[in-house]
From Swiss-Prot:
This is Dual-specificity RNA methyltransferase RlmN. It comes from the Bacteria. InterPro entries: Aldolase_TIM (IPR013785), Methyltransferase_A (IPR040072), RlmN_N (IPR048641), RNA_MTrfase_RlmN (IPR027492), rRNA_lsu_MTrfase_RlmN/Cfr (IPR004383), rSAM (IPR007197). Pfam families: Radical_SAM, RlmN_N. It comes from Rhizobium rhizogenes (strain K84 / ATCC BAA-868) (Agrobacterium radiobacter). Residues 130-379 form the Radical SAM core domain. Belongs to the radical SAM superfamily. RlmN family. The gene is rlmN. Reaction proceeds by a ping-pong mechanism involving intermediate methylation of a conserved cysteine residue.
């Protein structure tokens, strides 16, 4: 039996989803730590002796059962449910658009309600079904400040960070839509693993730089990996960064998930152009942080992502430099055929050259899979994500970026 189960007929039927709470001032319980959830309940009058029990109940209903309506919590008293409805929400974001690629990749454009005096924002989340696993690509920011020259998201101005709730809500909504919670069914025609979890892996590789939103990402990933809730193994969660060196150290110490580096060049002069954060954290500093990442072994390697750009970084000299750069680091090198997007000046390397590059690296003892492009037809592939939320004024954006730089010790 194939590890991929294709449901028929193939015509997509949107399944009912919970309606978002529009302009709701009520805080969400999603994304709160147990301690924060307990404090929120106490503030609304829950007796001290009941708080721990109530938190356990809510945790199970939200993250194990996947409910988005307090009335579905069958073992919670009616009075308690009424209090929860009056003061809190566990609603999902609004699905603005759902697209399904010919290869089964699924992309959601999600809208989150305003924060404070802000406006609603939109982000993209992508589900990639493969044999034996299903990977969810999650966004951490609305837009991005890093302006990597080959990345479509980099052309979208940074609007704001996502909260821990908004990061986790992408995972909860995907599991809703894919029938990955009890008593849920996926739309007919959905391609997904035939056995086990529909969302087995989570990668912080969507819109934004996760390590410029460290605290929210940390909270979300620790909740996602909590053994009494969503229970994703930390070895099945990968955080991808362009190289925010100070926070790479913190990621290893405080989160402990798998690490991926958006590398793309082996010389500082070229990487300065492709990945401008390299001007602040050059390759030597980045490699030092990688070598210090806790728990590295042949079974726990850092993934280095390398987009193949024709005539830019795809020579055998580049391959030789890559081998030298990664010496002593347990590594896997993902070679990514460049995914075109409207307005780009880059081209994908010829397939023959990509294979030569991969063979050269493989001969040196490094795993060097060529990533199969997924979801290109719906702009869901690596480097293609972008939403229409570009509403932060220039002065606000520059102030926000200056704050982030100050918080990371930049000049």
């Amino acid at each position: 039996m194939s590890a991929i189960d294709v449901m028929t007929p193939s015509k997509l039927k949107p399944m009912p989803v919970s309606q978002p709470v529009e302009l709701s001032p009520k805080p969400s319980l999603i994304g709160l730590t147990r301690e924060e959830m307990g404090a929120a309940l106490k503030e609304k009058g829950v007796a001290d002796k009941q708080v721990k029990m109530r938190v356990s109940q809510l945790w199970n209903w939200i993250y194990v059962r996947g409910v988005s309506d307090f009335d579905a919590m069958a073992n919670v008293s009616k009075d308690m449910r009424e209090m929860l409805k009056a003061h809190f929400t566990i609603a999902r974001p609004e699905i603005v658009e759902e697209q399904v690629s010919n290869d089964g990749t699924r992309k959601w454009l999600l809208r989150f309600p305003p924060r404070g005096a802000g406006r609603p924002v939109e982000v993209e989340t992508v589900y990639i079904p493969e044999e034996g696993r299903g990977t969810l690509c999650v966004s951490s920011q609305v837009g991005c400040s890093l302006t990597c020259s080959f990345c479509h998201t980099g052309t979208q101005r940074l609007v704001r960070n996502l909260t821990a709730e908004e990061i986790l809500s992408q995972l909860l909504l995907a599991r809703d839509r894919l029938g990955d919670f009890p008593d849920r069914e996926a739309p007919q025609g959905t391609i997904m693993p035939a056995e086990g979890r529909k969302v087995s892996n989570m990668v912080m590789m969507g819109m934004g730089e996760p390590l410029y939103n460290f605290e929210s990402v940390k909270t979300a990933l620790l909740i996602a990996s909590d053994g009494d809730g969503l229970s994703l193994s930390k070895r099945r969660i990968t955080l991808s960064t362009s190289g925010v060196v100070p926070e790479i150290y913190r990621t290893g110490d405080e989160i402990g998930v798998m690490l991926a580096i958006s590398l793309h060049a082996v010389r500082d002069d070229l990487r300065d152009m492709l990945v401008p954060i390299n001007k602040k954290y050059p390759l030597k500093e980045l490699m030092d942080a990688c070598r210090a990442y806790p728990g590295l072994s042949n079974a726990r390697r850092i993934t280095f992502e390398y987009v193949m750009l024709k005539g830019v970084n795809d020579s055998l000299e580049d391959a030789k430099g890559l081998i030298q750069l990664l010496k002593g680091i347990p590594s896997k090198i993902n070679l990514i055929p460049f995914n075109p997007w409207p307005g780009t000046n880059y081209q994908c390397s010829d397939w023959e050259q990509i294979e030569k590059f991969a063979d050269f690296i493989n001969a040196a003892g490094y795993a060097s899979p060529i990533r199969t492009p997924r979801g290109r037809d719906i702009l869901a592939a690596c480097g293609q994500l972008k939403s229409d939320s570009e509403r932060m004024r220039k002065t606000e954006r520059l102030a926000f970026e200056a704050m982030m730089i100050a918080n990371h010790g930049e000049d």
